[in-house]
Structures are given as structure tokens and as C-alpha cells.
A protein has these predicted regions:
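Hydrophobic alpha-helical transmembrane segments of multi-pass membrane proteins
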Residues: 22-33, 45-66, 193-210
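Non-cytosolic membrane-interface motifs at loop->transmembrane helix junctions
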Residues: 72-82, 138-139, 213-221
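The cytoplasmic-loop to transmembrane-helix boundary for the fourth helix
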Residues: 96-137, 245
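C-terminal transmembrane-bundle signature of multipass membrane proteins
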Residues: 164-174, 186-245
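Alpha-helical transmembrane segments in multipass membrane proteins, preferentially the mid-helix core
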Residues: 29-33, 90-97, 149-182
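Membrane-interfacial loop-to-transmembrane alpha-helix junctions, especially the N-terminal start
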Residues: 40-53, 106-111, 184-195, 215
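Internal transmembrane alpha-helix with an interfacial aromatic "cap," most often the third helix
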Residues: 28-38, 64-72, 82-114, 241
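Extracellular-loop-to-transmembrane junctions of the mid-late helices
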Residues: 9-23, 121-169
Length: 245
């Protein structure tokens, strides 16, 4: 009976909606945290991360709306553009600003803006190959032609490589200090490990799952782990042990 089938799928639907809502709230709160840091210190990488996290929140909100109310063309385009392309590249750009330095990387901001604008035009104008399914988790593979999918692949793989590589490089650099490593250095090592693990969770979730519940769950878990790593980088927290006698 259709009624019984609908009831059987209800727990999975509710779970997916809950995880998508949680991912939206966590990423939005994460963005507010980086915005607060940027307002206080005016560092370029924190502004880039703020923009990226609000883009992540927009993608999570689209996931939330799509799972809860049914997918439509505009909701899927927002989800795909912000989640698969723009937020990863902008996060990676922020990491380059931090690790390489604003002086060298800042001139490339306009390249990022131009590529982002190009991606927006492509995703918003690309014809849909088939009707957007109202249920489940639509994918670019079934709905878009080659160009939007290539943009998403390059952005996701390249951005994740920069994020994980930057975190691992920081851990190795701090680890080499040996006995000279401070409590703050150790905290930063754990923070970067958490960030790397969170990015890997997000990447694996996006690649491995095509059902809304596990995808939303890994999205929520991944951004939460990255947020935890970010909180560990707080200079006030890192400096706390040094104030003890």
C-alpha cells in the first residue's frame, strides 16, 4: 500500500532533514565565528573562509529544502553551485592566503572572482538533461552536461587537495620542532588534523553516497569536525596554557 510505503520511508526522511538542518546551522555558526575574527583582525584568509562558509551554509540549506519539501530546478542549482564548486575553491583560496601569504596570493583574488562568476553563469544557464526528481538526492551526473560536472570535479578535487595538503603540511612543520614544540603548537597540530579529517569526511560523503540520509549525515559530521578544528586554532585558547605558572 502506498500509505504504508510512505510511513516506512518517513524515519529516513526525518533523519536526513535533521542532519541537513544541523549542517546548515553549524556552517552558518562557523561562518559567524570566522566573520568575528575577520572584524577583529582584518586578515584576508579569514574573510575568504567567511565567504566560503556562508556558501557552504547556502548549499546545506538547499539540501535541507530539497529533502524536506521536494527538489526543484532552482534548489538543485543552488545546492550544486554553492556546495560542489564555489565553497571548496574559496576555502582553498583562504588556505593559500594563510600559508603562502596575502602579498603573493591577494592579486589572484580577481581570478577567483572571475572563475566564480563563470561557474555561476554555467550552472545557472546549463540546461537540465532530465526533470529534477522531487525525492532522493539528485546528482550532476544525471541532470547536467559535461561542463558543470567538470567544473565541480576540478573544484572539489583541487580544493580538497589544497585544504588537506595545507593541514598536513602544518602538522609536519610543527611536529619537526620536537622538544621546542609548545603546548600551543600541539594544540594547532590537533586542530589541523581535525580539519584534514573533516575535509576527508566531506569528500568521501560527496563521492560515496547518493542517498539523502548518509549524504546529509556525512555533511553534518564533516563540517562539525572542521569547525572543532577551527575552534582549536583560537589564539586565546592556544595561549591559555602559557599563562599558567
Amino acid at each position: 500500500m502506498p500509505g504504508l510505503a510512505d510511513l516506512a520511508s518517513l524515519p529516513a526522511l526525518v533523519t536526513a532533514v535533521a542532519f541537513a538542518a544541523a549542517a546548515t546551522l553549524v556552517s552558518f555558526g562557523f561562518g559567524l565565528s570566522t566573520l568575528d575574527r575577520w572584524i577583529g583582525r582584518r586578515r584576508d584568509h579569514e574573510l575568504a573562509w567567511t565567504v566560503a562558509l556562508f556558501l557552504f551554509a547556502a548549499a546545506s540549506f538547499a539540501l535541507w529544502a530539497g529533502v524536506a519539501t521536494g527538489w526543484t530546478g532552482p534548489i538543485f542549482r543552488l545546492f550544486y553551485l554553492c556546495g560542489a564548486i564555489l565553497n571548496v575553491v574559496t576555502l582553498a583560496f583562504g588556505t593559500l592566503l594563510l600559508l603562502v601569504g596575502s602579498t603573493r596570493v591577494r592579486p589572484w583574488t580577481w581570478v577567483l572572482v572571475a572563475l566564480g562568476g563563470f561557474a555561476c553563469g554555467v550552472v545557472l544557464a546549463a540546461p537540465l538533461e532530465t526533470a529534477v526528481p522531487s525525492e532522493g538526492l539528485p546528482t550532476g551526473r544525471e541532470l547536467f552536461g559535461p561542463l558543470p560536472r567538470v567544473l565541480a570535479s576540478v573544484a572539489s578535487i583541487g580544493g580538497a587537495a589544497v585544504l588537506v595538503g595545507g593541514a598536513v603540511w602544518t602538522v609536519v612543520r610543527l611536529g619537526r620542532r620536537g622538544r621546542d614544540r609548545t603546548a600551543g603548537d600541539t594544540r594547532l597540530m590537533w586542530a589541523n588534523l581535525a580539519i584534514a579529517v573533516g575535509v576527508v569526511i566531506l569528500g568521501l560523503g560527496g563521492a560515496a553516497f547518493e542517498e539523502p540520509t548518509p549524504f546529509a549525515a556525512t555533511t553534518c559530521l564533516g563540517i562539525t569536525v572542521v569547525f572543532a578544528g577551527f575552534l582549536l586554532t583560537n589564539p586565546r585558547i592556544a595561549a591559555a596554557p602559557s599563562r599558567s605558572p
